[in-house]
Amino acid sequence: MRKKAAGGAERRPLKPRTEAAAAAPAGRAMPSDHSRMKLRRDCSRPSLQWYTRAQNKMRRPNLLLKDILKCTLLLFGVWILFYILKLNHTTEECDMKRMPYMDPDRIKRAQQYAQQVLQKECRPQFAKRSMAQLFGSRYSLDLPPFVTKVPAESEAEYKYDPPFGFRKFSGKVQTLLELLPEHDFPEHLRAKSCKHCVVIGSGGILHGLEMGHALNQFDVVIRLNNAPVEGYSEHVGNKTTIRMTYPEGAPLSDLEYYSSDLFVTVLFKSVDFNWLQAMVKNETLPFWVRLFFWKQVAEKIPLQPKQFRILNPVIIKETAFDILQYSEPQSRFWGRDKNVPTIGVIAVVLATHLCDEVSLAGFSYALNQPRTPLHYFDNLCMAAMNFQTMHNVTTETNFLLKLVREGVVRDLSGGIHSEF
């Protein structure tokens, strides 16, 4: 029965949904709930074509970065190859068999001059006082040569990163010092009232001078890096008091180490601490640590723990920033500023803190003579120095020249300034 709505209009009763579906015309089925939900999902999903385009756009930056990386690696490889080829070319030109003729008269004068230096009266504290007079407050009179204790965080040792300081490495320094039973200069050398010292460089100028006998007579003989004694003692002597080096520079041959040597280590980077710890403990350095060195390093150092020392990094800082007045280190994406002194110049400054009288032998950077032998023991030419990017050898030569001319040190081989 039909009911009338307000206003007199008829109101038909609602049919159930199933009936409505049945009343739909044939061939035109009403969408079900499942179909409507599927349709809604399909409408909200991006088309496959749009998705592919978006994915391709995301890939483009990645491909660009990969191309840039490939080009960078290629350029770096070409640079390394060029450096190696150039270095090998220089090596071939400076075979020791082609050494320039050594004037016998000059050899005799050099030997006589060395004997004269040794025979002169030793003047206590002369090197220190002369350096202080020459450089004023830029040279410290009371700077300890070796690390003897873990410095306080506020001390100068922690102002810079290695090699100028030990910032962020206090734990590693403490570990190393606990392994070393002795930290100072040996007692028998400290007890000597006045010491004559000689720093023997690696310069080719030593070859043929036959100064070995004279060099052996100095109280303290400081040798650098892997400069050999075996096979060259006639020219460079065979006495060694200090072997001063860094991991990559340490001699690989056991024959270059003597039971009385002090092995003074210069620490440049984090893995250098690991290497020194392994050497002191007579352990094998892990392979993954070796990957961080730029050349092969010694696997063992045949010395006792009491013979190892750590160079005070403030001596390097004093040499670089105060005396040579290099700029302080700046963070760079690649390479270094030329603000790291050579081991040789650092050793000269160290000698003024250790010794009363200081002499040099085997120092010479004749950059205007590119075919002059660089070392007394290998085939490298002086031209090889033009490819290194860490040291300013011109500034260092001027510094050594100043020391020799002012009488602070004496040049026994005449490579910096000849006085014979």
Curated annotation (Swiss-Prot):
GO biological process: lipid metabolic process; protein glycosylation
Class of enzymatic activity (EC top level): transferase
InterPro entries: Glyco_trans_29, Glycosyltransferase_29, GT29-like_sf, Sialyl_trans
Topology class, membrane: Single-pass type II membrane protein
GO molecular function annotation: lactosylceramide alpha-2,3-sialyltransferase activity
Annotated region described as Disordered, given as residue ranges: 1-39
Record's keyword annotation contains Glycoprotein: yes
Ranges of the Cytoplasmic topological domain: 1-67
Basic and acidic residues: bias regions: 9-18
TM segment ranges: 68-88
Catalyses which reaction(s): a beta-D-Gal-(1->4)-beta-D-Glc-(1<->1)-Cer(d18:1(4E)) + CMP-N-acetyl-beta-neuraminate = a ganglioside GM3 (d18:1(4E)) + CMP + H(+); ganglioside GA2 (d18:1(4E)/18:0) + CMP-N-acetyl-beta-neuraminate = ganglioside GM2 (d18:1(4E)/18:0) + CMP + H(+); a beta-D-Gal-(1<->1')-ceramide + CMP-N-acetyl-beta-neuraminate = N-acetyl-alpha-neuraminosyl-(2->3)-beta-D-galactosyl-(1<->1')-ceramide + CMP + H(+); ganglioside GA1 (d18:1(4E)/18:0) + CMP-N-acetyl-beta-neuraminate = ganglioside GM1 (d18:1(4E)/18:0) + CMP + H(+)
Glycosylation: residue positions: 238
Subcellular location: Golgi apparatus membrane
Keyword list, A-Z: Disulfide bond, Glycoprotein, Glycosyltransferase, Golgi apparatus, Lipid metabolism, Membrane, Signal-anchor, Transferase, Transmembrane, Transmembrane helix
Record EC number: 2.4.3.9
Disulfide bonds: 197-355
UniProt feature, compositional bias: Low complexity: 20-29
Any one Gene Ontology cellular component term annotated for this protein: Golgi membrane
Side of membrane Lumenal, spans: 89-420
Main localization (coarse): Golgi
Coiled coil (residue ranges): none
Protein family according to the UniProt entry: Belongs to the glycosyltransferase 29 family.
Function: Transfers the sialyl group (N-acetyl-alpha-neuraminyl or NeuAc) from CMP-NeuAc to the non-reducing terminal galactose (Gal) of glycosphingolipids forming gangliosides (important molecules involved in the regulation of multiple cellular processes, including cell proliferation and differentiation, apoptosis, embryogenesis, development, and oncogenesis).
The protein's name: Lactosylceramide alpha-2,3-sialyltransferase
Source organism: Bos taurus
Gene from which this protein is expressed: ST3GAL5
